[in-house]
Design a protein with these regions (language model features):
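Extracellular/periplasmic catalytic domains that process cell-envelope and extracellular macromolecules
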Residues: 53-54, 144-146
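A general structural signal for short secondary-structure boundary/capping elements
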Residues: 134-140, 155-160
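Conserved P-loop NTPase motor cores
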Residues: 1-138
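Conserved P-loop NTPase motor module
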Residues: 145-174
Length: 174
């Protein structure tokens, strides 16, 4: 696993050689140079949460790490909030993410196109108290046709009538 660290950003990915990470690294380097901060590249070692400065906002992006050891990642999800850490866990299958520490500590779920089985499970887990499955399917279908890289948002910090369900980030459903 490769890792880049700045004072304010941490990107963790299984394969940093991908074009998107090369772009992100270049962009981050330019940003850090302007902010007089440094990016450090590490291999196969997650920094300890105790080393994160709680006085600065830190963003951690975990991408394509579902098959990696989850214990260090789980620590960030369960304890990171208290140290000013915001975590993003990017994966292809929501229900393969460890439940107790990662899924249960999620505030916002962003969904790209889903098959019927996963859509039903997401509905049953997060949505069933607010709308029936037919309405949820309609909402999801509208989200998926909104633009080229469409997605649906379920914001678990909000009420159903106050932006909990959105198409992209800006269009509330209920």
């Amino acid at each position: 696993m490769d890792i880049w660290i700045t004072t304010d950003w941490l990107y963790i990915a299984k394969s940093i050689h991908q074009p998107k990470y090369k772009f992100l690294h270049q962009w981050g380097s330019e940003l850090n140079e302007a902010a007089e901060k440094e990016i450090i590249s590490l291999n196969s070692a997650e920094p300890e949460i105790e080393n994160v400065n709680p006085n600065e906002r830190t963003i951690l992006v975990f991408d394509d790490v579902m098959l990696e050891k989850q214990t260090p990642i789980e620590r960030y999800f369960s304890q990171g909030r208290h140290s000013g850490v915001d975590c993003f866990y990017l994966c292809q299958s929501y229900f393969r993410i460890p439940k107790q520490c990662i899924r249960d500590n999620a505030n916002i779920i962003i969904l790209f196109n889903q098959d019927a089985k996963n859509l039903r499970a997401i509905h049953d887990t997060f949505v069933s108290g607010d709308m029936d499955f037919t309405e949820f399917r309609k909402f999801f279908s509208e989200c998926m046709t909104a633009c080229k890289h469409a997605f649906a948002v379920i914001d678990l910090t909000r009420e159903a009538n106050n932006g909990k369900y959105r198409s992209q980030f800006d269009k509330c459903y209920i």
